[in-house]
Amino acid sequence: MLGILNKVFDPTKRTLSRYEKKANEIDALKADIEKLSDEALKQKTIEFKERLEKGETVDDLLVEAFAVVREASRRVTGMFPFKVQLMGGVALHEGNIAEMKTGEGKTLTSTMPVYLNALSGKGVHVVTVNEYLASRDAEEMGKIFEFLGLTVGLNLNSLSKDEKREAYAADITYSTNNELGFDYLRDNMVLYKEQMVQRPLHFAVIDEVDSILIDEARTPLIISGQAAKSTKLYVQANAFVRTLKADQDYTYDVKTKGVQLTEEGMTKAEKAFGIENLFDVRHVALNHHIAQALKAHAAMHKDVDYVVEDGQVVIVDSFTGRLMKGRRYSDGLHQAIEAKEGLEIQNESMTLATITFQNYFRMYEKLAGMTGTAKTEEEEFRNIYNMQVVTIPTNKPIARDDRPDLIYRTMEGKFKAVAEDVAQRYMVGQPVLVGTVAVETSELISRLLKNKGIPHQVLNAKNHEREAQIIEDAGQKGAVTIATNMAGRGTDIKLGEGVKELGGLAVIGTERHESRRIDNQLRGRSGRQGDPGITQFYLSMEDELMKRFGAERTMAMLDRFGMDDSTPIQSKMVSRAVESSQKRVEGNNFDARKQLLQYDDVLRQQREVIYKQRFEVIDSDNLRSIVENMIKASLERAVASYTPKEDLPEEWNLDGLVELVNANFLDEGGVEKSDIFGKEPEEITELIYDRIKTKYDEKEERYGSEQMREFEKVIVLREVDTKWMDHIDAMDQLRQGIHLRAYAQTNPLREYQMEGFAMFENMIAAIEDDVAKFVMKAEIENNLEREEVIQGQTTAHQPKEGDEEKQAKKKPVRKAVDIGRNDPCYCGSGKKYKNCCGRTE
């Protein structure tokens, strides 16, 4: 009965049968399309575009367009998409995620919806995780599109602005997620409209969509300049932390990675730094530096969380095992690690622009994705991106043998067993892929195999340049490859001659990842396109994940049975416990990403407002009306603050108002107290505003309209950019401290939204006030030029594969005066440096 109900109510089955129907319709056109000459096939593109102009939709063209691409693919590449690939293509066109197993031809599948959506002329972005894959796919699949008369662009990190603009102007653009995000941010920092490179975001197809929209979701892309801060405290805090003893002076929680000073540790800190109370407001910075130094020593491990390369601390991505060059830990943690490793400490940077992948990709009109593993994250894709996950059946049934986990008592026993298993398979020539979770594990297994005299390749964050080549060779007879996590995604492991007879590729997992998806990716490397294969995970009671669900009890049970370290157990109960532990961790990670998105949405709304207004500024030929509105708003606020409604008119501070108006808008004597005495606030505003407009007209007559228009743009852009930059910084500080509100029985998110909104309103008011003041009071120089508010921008993000020499991080240009942005200004005005001389330097 339940089976019948499932068939009736399972939406996936209904969706698949609908896709199958479409695939059959496309397949039915095969014979007709085959008869067309190359010229007639190319002509179809022009015909489709004309039909779209006459009012047909892309949905109306789907069946014919897919059939045309299918035939073009056969003629150009020799590959003819299977029916299941047609179904995957329909899923992508509908803005869903096509879950297709490894080796099922995802790249070819994407060509059909990409072509169909590119016919509108609005541009389609095909997104991959690294530049190697973007270049490869643009080269291989681009031939199909060019054969059909569409243009193809490849957007790389090394391109100039003109080359990028050309790449984005193409019908189809191949790029990495990082480059798309950074180009968007850079476009919203340009000073002239002609410098922008992107078009409005229309349709994107993301390859390895789970990696980009889930694993990378919390990673903000940041463009930054540098703030001058002393590095001395990092060195002092590091020297102090080295003297502390674990458990006695500080506590460390493995699960949360939380590090805390004990009472004894606090007393030691106070003695070491010669202060009375570590938590005195004056010692906030010291407290912060000690906390970060402590985290660097206790929670961050070399060759697991980061590696040291060429005198730089480089983060290791815990999901992909790749090095993330150019990306830095925030909040001073990176500097603390540099101090720990005895490296040169680099200054903290000032954020100029930032966005997360979650928010960038949600700006597209339509978004689709493909991957081999997405079903476990179905809820997240549905809730956050409004995308359904559709599991596309394989072209041939899966013949892989997924064996139950083997569980050992200790790590030592487990690794010995792994080395033994690899040795036995190597003896008969069966290729083996060993998957590890950390760089140090891959190096440990490498040592064990060396001792046994087994030649092998190690693929981890330290040598990803040769990644694709190593992975391609991993299916050859006698090949042994050790890979950290899923390095090498996007490259197929094809079986060499005689390997099928040996049982195909053997995949050995050395521990379970906290995400089932990563485990499934590792399994999926074997048994592609119906090939034979075997997968086996080796676990130990000392593994990170096993500790989380109470491995102590199981250890005690094994001791009672007198089990030694060389005998594994195959227990369904333990395997189920591991899976439920993974589900719990996945749930926690989803909640964390969802919460981050709620916080990030506050900044997203503000960013959209600022970027929209900023674009209007650079797009407009005449800003005078916008500037006049700003002046009026600023004036209304000034009048309201000096003539409060709750006070009697005789209590109003008219002297103060006259002084402010003459200082900020008019000149000495521009308005007298007698002019406004006895008038209502509205009348006062009108009178003063009329005089301001007269002065504005005189100024325009003096300098000429053309120079005045450029002057307005210079002022508005500078004020918007400076204030927005400070605002991002302030919002970040607010975000860091807001969780403390939970202790005060308030909802931190609600507080963040309310305070963030108030701060945003204050920022807009500050922009209006300063624009009004500068436009009315500043004199125009002859060499009028728009200029960036901070020189020396750098981008913090992942490296571009195989592009190391281009990766040399540009050191931002520092201002000549070595003074912090929030320090008192050196001119003696009493204002903060950033609000005084720092504004013009």
From Swiss-Prot:
Chief site of localization: membrane
Cellular-component GO terms for this entry: cell envelope Sec protein transport complex; cytosol; plasma membrane
The protein's required cofactors: Zn(2+)
Catalytic activity: ATP + H2O + cellular proteinSide 1 = ADP + phosphate + cellular proteinSide 2
PROSITE patterns: SECA, SECA_MOTOR_DEAD
Spans annotated as Disordered: 790-814
Cofactor note: May bind 1 zinc ion per subunit.
Keywords for this protein: ATP-binding, Cell membrane, Cytoplasm, Membrane, Metal-binding, Nucleotide-binding, Protein transport, Translocase, Translocation, Transport, Zinc
E.C. number: 7.4.2.8
Subcellular location: Cell membrane; Cytoplasm
Gene3D superfamilies linked to this entry: Helical scaffold and wing domains of SecA (1.10.3060.10), P-loop containing nucleotide triphosphate hydrolases (3.40.50.300), SecA, preprotein cross-linking domain (3.90.1440.10)
Residues that coordinate or bind ATP: 85, 103-107, 492
GO molecular function, one term: protein-exporting ATPase activity
Annotated CDD domains: DEXDc_SecA, SF2_C_secA
Enzyme class: translocase
Compositional bias per record (Basic and acidic residues), positions renumbered to this chain: 798-807
Membrane-related topology note: Peripheral membrane protein
A Gene Ontology biological process term: protein transport by the Sec complex
Binding site for Zn(2+): 825, 827, 836-837
Any single Pfam family the record assigns to this protein: SEC-C
Described purpose of this protein according to its UniProt entry: Part of the Sec protein translocase complex. Interacts with the SecYEG preprotein conducting channel. Has a central role in coupling the hydrolysis of ATP to the transfer of proteins into and across the cell membrane, serving as an ATP-driven molecular motor driving the stepwise translocation of polypeptide chains across the membrane.
HAMAP family: SecA (MF_01382)
Self-association and partners: Monomer and homodimer. Part of the essential Sec protein translocation apparatus which comprises SecA, SecYEG and auxiliary proteins SecDF. Other proteins may also be involved.
Family: Belongs to the SecA family.
Protein name per the record: Protein translocase subunit SecA
Species assigned in the record: Bacillus licheniformis (strain ATCC 14580 / DSM 13 / JCM 2505 / CCUG 7422 / NBRC 12200 / NCIMB 9375 / NCTC 10341 / NRRL NRS-1264 / Gibson 46)
